[in-house]
């Protein structure tokens, strides 16, 4: 994939019919009858189409995983309405006790549920199959298709050769099945140290695909497993476990990303070998690859994400700048917006870059419909209405959503002292500035409408000793209140928001931007850390309208004129709100 290829923005705002070559494959298989009237090993009827999502619990899921989740569960949902039915299994590929953890496993299940998908009773673990995997390994040994190799890891690596050079057979390749079987059982029984022996498949050390050069499928690890404890000291590797787990679960279409394309011949070799040996029967699963998600301004390498966390470039796995599911959830993204995003980008065989704006637009399109409106002043500047008496209050209201009157109104008061945005005032206005500015020469100050309130005219301003504006003074026109007959008598171009200073709710607001300044921070020989955006998080003190006081964690709003915000999942409390900016009203990244 070329790093110079332009990311796609064409579908950022439009709903399009996603391309999906996998549907064509499934349709063909169904039409051919390849997966009709299927039964499992026990003879029980099973759905024609079974997909699966099988992450390894060695880290937190990220936005790239969301594409696979939506694809596999989405296909199952769509084809469940067709003859034969369909389902998607949830499987945790937990075969490496060194890197896996219950924390990661729990977070994966939570993320899939949060995205809106349900596996019902079909939750599986690769560790559930350890006994069967061992049994099948013995069958392969007895048939002469696997052997115990006693070379060191370095020698195994060296003797594999490279793309231009064939590998060398191990000096232990011709051990008899009986000797291999005894050694393998001794490995299982803990008689050897880590790394002393491995089990390899006997395929072809001169194969043009290096993956097929007698791959290692079992290794010794004297490490307890988080589910099986100390029962095992040998563990199967991914390539061995993955395809056999698919076959045991009767997966019809094993869907994975393109980086596993070279592993497909090994997948087929293992499954077909066990079929020939009477373990499995047709139809056996087949692997299909699709292009992974490449999102601009983002990295998805687990190793590099871990580095960001451990070196404290971010504040944890759920930092709203992280591409993890827990991170983008805390940022304010909704399950619906992520599913919409995955639908819009479609599925293909060719790698490409998707612009971050496509994901952002999916969130805007979702929250535009569902998020109630509210007022927030992010850069407060005091506004004093000179001809409005201090004790007086004028009741005002605004719709919770302009398109849904049934949602009702927000109620608030107009008072003498208000908060407005500092950006809504200029001492010396530039051309085209239609908000507040003071009298200039013989000309009166500007007039603007305070939204849902009155028209006001600027009469002056005050500054501190450093010349910073600290207060803007205005007069209001009592007959100009929004919604009253007299309001139409005032024609103004500026329309700004405000909050009563007496009723404003203090709040912390966190303004997030891209974590990286480079759209391709991980490309070529770049050090991705050099592209970290030093301004990716800004924390400010703001004011919110009164109705926001008791906002609950993960409540989402459109702060009018600003964007979409969410009450922080971890830190926001009723009476002490903390809001994160999820996305602006429009794409503002340059």
From Swiss-Prot:
Motif interval(s): 'HIGH' region: 55-65
Recorded catalytic activity of this chain's protein: tRNA(Gln) + L-glutamine + ATP = L-glutaminyl-tRNA(Gln) + AMP + diphosphate
EC code: 6.1.1.18
Domain of life: Bacteria
InterPro entries reported in the protein's UniProt record: aa-tRNA-synth_I_CS, Gln-tRNA-synth, Gln/Glu-tRNA_Ligase, Gln_tRNA_ligase_bac, Glu/Gln-tRNA-synth_Ib_cat-dom, Glu/Gln-tRNA-synth_Ib_codon-bd, Glu_tRNA_lig_a-bdl, Rbsml_bL25/Gln-tRNA_synth_N
Record-listed ATP binding positions: 56-58, 62-68, 257, 292-293
Self-association and partners: Monomer.
Protein name: Glutamine--tRNA ligase
Natural source organism: Polynucleobacter necessarius subsp. necessarius (strain STIR1)
